[in-house]
Structure formats: structure tokens, C-alpha cells
Curated annotation (Swiss-Prot):
Disulfide links within the chain: none
Cited Gene3D superfamilies: P-loop containing nucleotide triphosphate hydrolases, Translation factors
Lineage, broadest ranks: Bacteria, Pseudomonadati, Pseudomonadota, Alphaproteobacteria, Hyphomicrobiales
Source organism of the structure: Methylocella silvestris (strain DSM 15510 / CIP 108128 / LMG 27833 / NCIMB 13906 / BL2)
Domain of life: Bacteria
HAMAP family in the cross-refs: EF_Tu_B
Region (G1): 19-26
Protein name, as recorded: Elongation factor Tu
Region spans: G4: 136-139
Ranges where the tr-type G domain occurs: 10-206
Family statement drawn from the similarity comment of this UniProt entry: Belongs to the TRAFAC class translation factor GTPase superfamily. Classic translation factor GTPase family. EF-Tu/EF-1A subfamily.
G2, as annotated region: 60-64
Key words of the record: Cytoplasm, Elongation factor, GTP-binding, Hydrolase, Magnesium, Metal-binding, Nucleotide-binding, Protein biosynthesis
One matching Pfam family: GTP_EFTU_D3
Amino acid sequence: MGKEKFQRNKPHCNIGTIGHVDHGKTSLTAAITKVLAETGGATYTAYDQIDKAPEEKARGITISTAHVEYETKKRHYAHVDCPGHADYVKNMITGAAQMDGAILVVSAADGPMPQTREHILLARQVGVPALVVFMNKVDMVDDAELLELVELEVRELLSKYDFPGDDIPITKGSALCALEGKQPEIGHDAVLALMDTVDAYIPQPERPIDLPFLMPVEDVFSISGRGTVVTGRVERGIVKVGEEIEIVGLKPTVKTVVTGVEMFRKLLDQGQAGDNIGALLRGTKREDVERGQVLCKPGSVKPHTKFKAEAYILTKDEGGRHTPFFTNYRPQFYFRTTDVTGVVTLPEGTEMVMPGDNVTMDVELIAPIAMEEKLRFAIREGGRTVGAGVVASITE
């Protein structure tokens, strides 16, 4: 049978399953597709199809990720599930699979484990907006008090990492029962209840086009008699001819006016998210703008040099470093379209960072970059990628 075409008349949302190894993330993913397939909202994808996820490259890093899609009455979802813990770390840090929200899977039989904690921390650091919880394997626990205890532990852990632990919906069930068609109240019905909480609790993300205008500068030309043209792909928002914009990063911020927008050599009255455009800037000299700056809606983005980041350092096999690095490491940080040198300070108690580690670190750049939380970057040495990171918070 041919692939069903999903009707794109529902709002779209990207989610994923996170949590400790063997707590049932992949079983739950399979169970969601099985239960929603009954109402035509999904094609059932079996556990072993999801588990042998294909490898993908994101920013030069190989990541195994499985993608399934399904829909509820309310939304259309793209759902990511990773086979290994390292894949989650890489995925969340590189933003390879954007997550607007996540389902944290915790085994009721084991309670929160080290990767439960690490995935919650990563979700906080990389800016996953909302989590819901599925307490799995409740068929293996006879003691109701034990279930309450695990729920309490999970809520405390969420609160510790600045998620609203008291308010986050927790659904108790068994992915295996749902897959095997047993005990519907903890199987089939629990999966439907979980999807209701995902629908209700994970906020609908804003579409890129509705956000404030931003375009990274890729190239700058001067056209005699017309002025300076800046080219790039609009990252978000809309820019209209005649609008005032700011040029931010690397140099002091300046204001200018967009006097023309062209795409494929045709003049347009606006450029929007996803468009590759040339923007003609009034009274701007060719040497006033350079690659690595951004054009943006005035006041929407500020230039910064100091930030806290969550980073993943590539292994030797991934083409990364062969040796550890220490505080005062000075690589290049590749933001959007350019490299800027920065100095790394490791957290108290972290002596060094080995290839294959993920780490929270402080960075100070030698030149300011238009920056905000959740912005992704690559860490490079002489043009070779040795790591990937995300801005967790801005220091100054």
C-alpha cells in the first residue's frame, strides 16, 4: 500500500522521547503509532523498525535518529527517537531534530536514573520549551505507594532543573501492554491520555515567519549607481521594502533602510523566512557590512561576547580532537556564517574535557556576535569541526 498523504491542515509540532536507556522510549514511540493508527492518524511503525534508526550527519556529526509522524485530533507531529544515549546528547545540542517539546519516559520499576537526570538537564540547557512525563512499566509494579514515590521523585527532579515539576502532567501506563493489546486501561487508554496531555500542555511553536526579522549576512556587493547589496537566507520574519533594520555584530550596531529586495534577479516588495534574498541598503558602504553580521528588526537582537554553552566534543573517530582540552582553550566558534575566536573556561571541578564528552562551559569571544539563547554553533580548529554547541544563557 502507498504512503498516506498527511493532510497539512493542522498545526505542526516537533516532539521526541527522552529518558534513561531501557525505560521504554522506543516501545512508547511504537505504541503511539499503533494506537493512533486505529483512527487513521498514523501508520503503525514496529519497535524494530524504529530501533534500527538510520545515521544522519548534522554539522559534520553522525547521529542515529528515527523519525515517525502521526496526528491527533488537534495537531500533526513529527516525533524523534534515538537509539543510544550519545545520539540524544548530540541531537539535542546540535538541534539536528528540533524539539518543541518532549515526552520524558521513566520506568516505574526503576524510578529516575542518571540519564533521566542528564536528559532533563540537556532539555533545560538547549531550551526545550515543555516536557510531559510517561511513567512506563506500571504493569511491573504492584505497590501503589511505590508509584507515588516515583512520581514524587520525578517531580522533584524536574523542579531542580527549573521545569514546573508540580504542574507537569504525568501519565501512568505500559507501552508494552499497548503494543500487545493487553490491559487497555494502562495500555491503549494510557497512550491516548498521554497524547491528550501532549496536545494540551506542549505549546504550539510560533512559525518562523511570525518572529522578528533576522537574516545572517553571507555576502556583500556594491552595485554602481544602486548602492550596497547584502545577500543571505532569511532565518525568520519578514522584511519589507522601506523598512528600517539594524546591522548587528562584529562592529557597533548601525541602522539603515532596506530600499529593495530581490530574489532570483526579480524585484520583490518583501522577503520572508526561508527566502534567499539580496537586500539593497540605503547609504551603506560596502565596507560597513561583512559576513558574520546579521540584518534584523531594530532592537530584536543584541551583540554579545560572553555566554554559557552546552557543548558536545567530537571523538577522534568522528574527525575530532585526539587529545583533551583545558581551561583557556582558544578555538573558533562558528555562528551562522562566520568564525570568531573565543576563550573557554571550564566549570569548577572539571579539570579537562575529553573527546566524546559533553560539557557546560563559559565562553568569551574576541568580537561581539548577534546572539540569543538556543543559538547553535560549531567549535572549529582551523576550519575543522571539533565540536557543536548551543547558547544556554548570555552572560554579557
